[in-house]
Protein backbone atom coordinates (compact mmCIF):
# COMPACT_ATOMS: atom_id res chain seq x y z
CA UNK A 1 0.00 0.00 0.00
CA UNK A 2 1.28 3.48 -0.69
CA UNK A 3 2.22 5.46 2.40
CA UNK A 4 1.06 9.05 2.94
CA UNK A 5 3.74 11.71 3.38
CA UNK A 6 2.95 15.25 4.57
CA UNK A 7 1.52 16.63 1.35
CA UNK A 8 -1.94 17.40 0.07
CA UNK A 9 -3.51 14.48 -1.78
CA UNK A 10 -4.95 15.12 -5.22
CA UNK A 11 -7.95 13.20 -6.51
CA UNK A 12 -6.19 12.09 -9.69
CA UNK A 13 -3.40 9.56 -9.15
CA UNK A 14 0.09 10.51 -10.29
CA UNK A 15 0.66 6.88 -11.31
CA UNK A 16 -2.09 4.40 -12.05
CA UNK A 17 -1.59 0.81 -13.18
CA UNK A 18 -4.54 -1.39 -14.09
CA UNK A 19 -4.30 -5.13 -14.78
CA UNK A 20 -0.66 -4.86 -15.83
CA UNK A 21 1.01 -7.98 -17.22
CA UNK A 22 4.49 -8.55 -18.60
CA UNK A 23 5.06 -12.02 -19.95
CA UNK A 24 8.22 -12.89 -21.84
CA UNK A 25 8.10 -15.40 -24.67
CA UNK A 26 6.93 -15.88 -28.24
CA UNK A 27 3.31 -16.76 -27.51
CA UNK A 28 2.86 -14.47 -24.50
CA UNK A 29 0.08 -12.25 -25.88
CA UNK A 30 -1.92 -15.13 -27.32
CA UNK A 31 -1.60 -17.18 -24.15
CA UNK A 32 -2.63 -14.22 -22.01
CA UNK A 33 -5.70 -13.61 -24.19
CA UNK A 34 -6.64 -17.30 -24.00
CA UNK A 35 -6.18 -17.35 -20.22
CA UNK A 36 -8.68 -14.48 -19.80
CA UNK A 37 -6.41 -12.87 -17.21
CA UNK A 38 -5.97 -15.94 -15.00
CA UNK A 39 -2.25 -16.56 -15.27
CA UNK A 40 -0.79 -19.79 -13.95
CA UNK A 41 3.00 -19.35 -14.05
CA UNK A 42 3.60 -23.11 -14.46
CA UNK A 43 1.30 -23.34 -17.50
CA UNK A 44 3.04 -20.36 -19.09
CA UNK A 45 6.47 -21.77 -18.22
CA UNK A 46 5.58 -25.10 -19.85
CA UNK A 47 4.77 -23.12 -23.02
CA UNK A 48 8.18 -21.41 -22.96
CA UNK A 49 7.04 -18.16 -21.36
CA UNK A 50 8.16 -16.40 -18.20
CA UNK A 51 5.68 -14.35 -16.17
CA UNK A 52 7.40 -11.14 -15.05
CA UNK A 53 4.38 -9.13 -13.84
CA UNK A 54 1.06 -10.80 -13.09
CA UNK A 55 -2.01 -8.54 -12.92
CA UNK A 56 -0.51 -5.57 -11.04
CA UNK A 57 -3.02 -2.83 -10.18
CA UNK A 58 -2.36 0.16 -7.94
CA UNK A 59 -2.53 3.94 -7.66
CA UNK A 60 -0.01 6.40 -6.27
CA UNK A 61 -1.28 9.87 -5.38
CA UNK A 62 0.76 13.03 -4.91
CA UNK A 63 2.58 12.91 -1.57
CA UNK A 64 2.48 9.13 -1.32
CA UNK A 65 5.43 6.77 -1.33
CA UNK A 66 5.16 3.30 -2.79
CA UNK A 67 7.51 0.50 -1.80
CA UNK A 68 7.74 -2.49 -4.11
CA UNK A 69 9.10 -5.47 -2.21
CA UNK A 70 9.67 -9.05 -3.21
CA UNK A 71 12.14 -11.85 -3.56
CA UNK A 72 14.90 -11.79 -6.13
CA UNK A 73 13.40 -12.48 -9.54
CA UNK A 74 9.84 -11.70 -8.47
CA UNK A 75 9.33 -8.93 -11.05
CA UNK A 76 10.02 -5.69 -9.13
CA UNK A 77 12.43 -4.28 -11.72
CA UNK A 78 10.24 -5.54 -14.57
CA UNK A 79 7.26 -3.67 -13.11
CA UNK A 80 9.31 -0.47 -12.84
CA UNK A 81 10.62 -0.89 -16.38
CA UNK A 82 7.01 -1.20 -17.60
CA UNK A 83 5.98 1.93 -15.68
CA UNK A 84 8.83 3.88 -17.30
CA UNK A 85 8.19 2.19 -20.69
CA UNK A 86 11.73 0.89 -20.89
CA UNK A 87 9.88 -2.39 -21.43
CA UNK A 88 6.44 -2.57 -22.99
CA UNK A 89 3.89 -4.52 -20.97
CA UNK A 90 2.13 -7.46 -22.57
CA UNK A 91 -1.24 -6.10 -21.47
CA UNK A 92 -2.76 -3.53 -19.14
CA UNK A 93 -2.99 0.20 -18.70
CA UNK A 94 -0.51 2.72 -17.25
CA UNK A 95 -1.51 6.33 -16.65
CA UNK A 96 0.93 9.04 -15.56
CA UNK A 97 -0.94 12.14 -14.36
CA UNK A 98 -3.94 10.91 -16.36
CA UNK A 99 -2.00 10.43 -19.60
CA UNK A 100 -1.95 6.99 -21.19
CA UNK A 101 1.71 6.00 -21.16
CA UNK A 102 1.17 3.29 -23.78
CA UNK A 103 -0.27 5.82 -26.25
CA UNK A 104 2.65 8.26 -25.94
CA UNK A 105 4.95 8.92 -28.87
CA UNK A 106 8.71 8.51 -28.49
CA UNK A 107 9.03 12.30 -28.25
CA UNK A 108 6.44 12.43 -25.44
CA UNK A 109 8.19 9.58 -23.63
CA UNK A 110 11.54 11.36 -23.84
CA UNK A 111 9.97 14.53 -22.44
CA UNK A 112 8.29 12.57 -19.64
CA UNK A 113 11.52 10.80 -18.69
CA UNK A 114 13.53 14.03 -18.76
CA UNK A 115 11.12 16.08 -16.72
CA UNK A 116 8.85 13.90 -14.60
CA UNK A 117 10.41 10.54 -13.84
CA UNK A 118 13.71 8.86 -13.34
CA UNK A 119 15.01 5.43 -12.55
CA UNK A 120 18.11 4.52 -10.58
CA UNK A 121 19.43 1.19 -11.79
CA UNK A 122 21.04 -1.38 -9.52
CA UNK A 123 24.19 -1.20 -11.61
CA UNK A 124 24.75 2.47 -12.33
CA UNK A 125 27.16 3.83 -14.89
CA UNK A 126 29.16 6.79 -13.64
CA UNK A 127 31.76 8.21 -15.97
CA UNK A 128 35.05 7.02 -14.43
CA UNK A 129 37.12 9.93 -15.79
CA UNK A 130 34.79 12.58 -14.33
CA UNK A 131 34.57 13.72 -10.71
CA UNK A 132 31.44 13.50 -8.58
CA UNK A 133 30.58 17.10 -9.46
CA UNK A 134 31.21 16.55 -13.17
CA UNK A 135 29.14 13.34 -13.20
CA UNK A 136 26.19 15.21 -11.68
CA UNK A 137 26.58 18.29 -13.91
CA UNK A 138 27.04 16.35 -17.16
CA UNK A 139 23.37 15.37 -17.79
CA UNK A 140 22.32 18.96 -17.06
CA UNK A 141 24.77 20.21 -19.68
CA UNK A 142 23.53 17.62 -22.19
CA UNK A 143 20.02 18.91 -21.51
CA UNK A 144 21.18 22.45 -22.40
CA UNK A 145 22.11 24.09 -19.09
CA UNK A 146 25.13 26.37 -19.11
CA UNK A 147 28.30 25.07 -17.47
CA UNK A 148 27.99 27.65 -14.70
CA UNK A 149 24.34 26.81 -13.98
CA UNK A 150 24.90 23.06 -14.13
CA UNK A 151 27.86 23.27 -11.71
CA UNK A 152 25.79 25.36 -9.28
CA UNK A 153 22.91 22.88 -9.43
CA UNK A 154 25.32 19.95 -9.13
CA UNK A 155 26.82 21.47 -5.96
CA UNK A 156 23.31 21.75 -4.51
CA UNK A 157 22.70 18.08 -5.33
CA UNK A 158 26.02 17.05 -3.74
CA UNK A 159 24.84 18.68 -0.51
CA UNK A 160 21.38 17.13 -0.82
CA UNK A 161 22.71 13.56 -1.10
CA UNK A 162 25.27 14.05 1.68
CA UNK A 163 28.49 14.01 -0.35
CA UNK A 164 29.74 17.46 0.65
CA UNK A 165 33.54 17.39 0.64
CA UNK A 166 33.70 14.67 -2.02
CA UNK A 167 32.94 16.83 -5.07
CA UNK A 168 36.38 16.23 -6.58
CA UNK A 169 36.49 12.49 -5.92
CA UNK A 170 36.38 10.06 -8.82
CA UNK A 171 33.88 7.17 -8.74
CA UNK A 172 36.63 4.65 -7.91
CA UNK A 173 37.33 6.62 -4.71
CA UNK A 174 33.74 6.23 -3.43
CA UNK A 175 31.96 3.37 -1.70
CA UNK A 176 29.13 1.61 -3.53
CA UNK A 177 26.55 3.54 -1.50
CA UNK A 178 28.24 6.85 -2.27
CA UNK A 179 28.32 5.98 -5.98
CA UNK A 180 24.61 5.18 -5.78
CA UNK A 181 23.97 8.63 -4.27
CA UNK A 182 25.86 10.25 -7.17
CA UNK A 183 23.58 8.31 -9.53
CA UNK A 184 20.52 9.56 -7.64
CA UNK A 185 21.77 13.16 -7.68
Where are these regions (language model features)?
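Hydrophobic anchor residue at the start of the ABC signature
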Residues: 184
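Conserved ABC ATPase "signature" region
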Residues: 16, 33-42, 97-100, 141, ...
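ABC ATPase NBD coupling module
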Residues: 43-47, 101-118, 147-148
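Short coil-to-helix segment of the ABC ATPase nucleotide-binding domain corresponding to the Q-loop/switch region
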Residues: 130-137
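Signature (C-motif/LSGGQ) region and adjacent switch/coupling loops
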Residues: 105, 133, 146, 159, ...
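Helix-to-loop junction immediately C-terminal to a conserved catalytic motif
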Residues: 84
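Conserved ABC ATPase signature
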Residues: 170-174, 178-180
Amino acid sequence: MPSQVDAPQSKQPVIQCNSLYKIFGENAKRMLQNSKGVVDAKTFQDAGCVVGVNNASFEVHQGELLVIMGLSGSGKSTLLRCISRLTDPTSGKILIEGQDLLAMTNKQLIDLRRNKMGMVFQSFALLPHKTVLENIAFPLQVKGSSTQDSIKRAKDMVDLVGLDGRENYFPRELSGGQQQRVGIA
